[in-house]
Curated annotation (Swiss-Prot):
InterPro entries: Beta/alpha-defensin_C, Defensin_beta-like. It comes from Bos taurus (Bovine). Belongs to the beta-defensin family. One of its GO terms (biological process) is defense response to bacterium. Gene3D superfamilies: Antimicrobial Peptide, Beta-defensin 2, Chain A (3.10.360.10). Has bactericidal activity. The lineage of its organism: Eukaryota, Metazoa, Chordata, Craniata, Vertebrata. This is Beta-defensin C7. GO terms for molecular function: CCR6 chemokine receptor binding; chemoattractant activity. GO terms for cellular component: extracellular space. The keyword Signal applies. Disulfide bonds join 20-49, 27-42, 32-50. Pfam families: Defensin_beta.
Amino acid sequence: LALLFLVLSAGSGISGPLSCRRKGGICILIRCPGPMRQIGTCFGRPVKCCRSW
């Protein structure tokens, strides 16, 4: 899990993981679970930036 986070944190651009984290989101490889909503992407379409509302 930690390795996955490091891999997902290695980009830029909300199209980058750092921007996603600054907006209070997390990068997820699948669709956003439960009460979370997609607010952007981390590495293009496959990786979503999700945040709880």
